[in-house]
Regions:
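Conserved N-terminal catalytic core of the sugar/cofactor nucleotidyltransferase
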Residues: 2-5, 13-15, 27, 31-103
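Conserved alpha/beta core of the MobA/IspD/sugar-nucleotide pyrophosphorylase nucleotidyltransferase superfamily
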Residues: 3, 163-238
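Short beta-strand/turn micro-motifs composed of small residues
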Residues: 7, 53, 108, 131-132
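A structural signal for short hydrophobic beta-strand segments in well-ordered beta-sheet cores
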Residues: 25, 141-144, 213
């Protein structure tokens, strides 16, 4: 399996809050946000990881050291020399480095899901989206039919209670590339001004593919995408 970790964002909110290092290098409870995020992927440590990071972050040695400590040995680091149009484009830049016939599992760098929740034995369907239930409209949302099949996925439009955690599975890396090209490259489509991954599943659904979700209990999900969320996590009792 190809594990793609998107780290290409600017982290404006953390900069405004006074942080002077990239978001994923911030330390909370003795671990960097990078390490907390990678704990989520503990079941996949033997797979091939591809990290996409801003070149100006000079983060290669940081990632190498973190991977050595965590136990991730098979990885590539791709440095980006420009800001992308969103997570979907960032992930697409990893495709040339993937085994295109193998599945691709894309994850962000600012969510900690407790170890053991995301495992490869629960993945089903042509597409698979780990979700949890949370309040607010700032998530991607997945609507299901009565059989548990995804029938619609929307960014920042609350069509259901199932919120994505920022992890996205596609049956093959080649399939991801084909959908990305159809939805974003050929049509120039944007959702809320960006190229998000979530809407790509609508293309799959419209073309008869099966998209499923995982419903993770909220107590196992710790979102670390803003300074406020980091403070909440800091104050959680172990």
């Amino acid at each position: 399996m190809n594990i793609v970790i998107t780290m290409g964002g600017l982290g404006y909110r953390f900069q405004k809050a006074g942080y002077t290092v990239p978001k994923y290098q911030i330390e909370v409870k003795g671990k960097t946000l990078f390490e907390w995020s990678m704990i989520s992927m503990d079941a996949f440590k033997k797979e091939t990881f591809i990290f996409l990071v801003r070149k100006e972050d000079n983060a290669t040695s940081f990632i190498e050291n973190e991977c050595a400590r965590i136990g991730i040995s098979n990885y590539k680091i791709i440095e980006l020399d420009r800001l992308t149009k969103g997570q979907a484009e960032t992930a697409s830049l990893a495709i040339p480095y993937c085994d295109k016939d193998k599945p691709i599992f894309i994850y962000n760098i600012d969510t900690y899901v407790e170890a053991g929740q995301m495992t490869d034995d629960i993945i089903i369907g042509d597409g698979f989206i780990p979700c949890f239930k949370a309040e607010g409209d700032h998530w991607s949302f997945v609507k299901l039919d009565s059989n548990g099949n995804a029938i619609e996925v929307r960014e920042k439009t609350r069509i259901s209670d199932y919120c994505t955690i920022g992890a996205y599975y596609f049956r093959t890396a080649q399939l991801y590339q084909e959908i990305y090209d159809e939805l974003y490259v050929k049509s120039g489509y944007l959702e809320h001004g960006e190229q998000y991954i979530a809407p790509m599943y609508n293309w799959m659904i419209q073309h008869g593919m099966n998209v499923r979700i995982q419903d993770i209990e909220p107590k196992y999900v710790h979102v670390l995408g803003t300074p406020e969320e980091v403070e909440v996590f800091k104050n959680l009792k172990n």
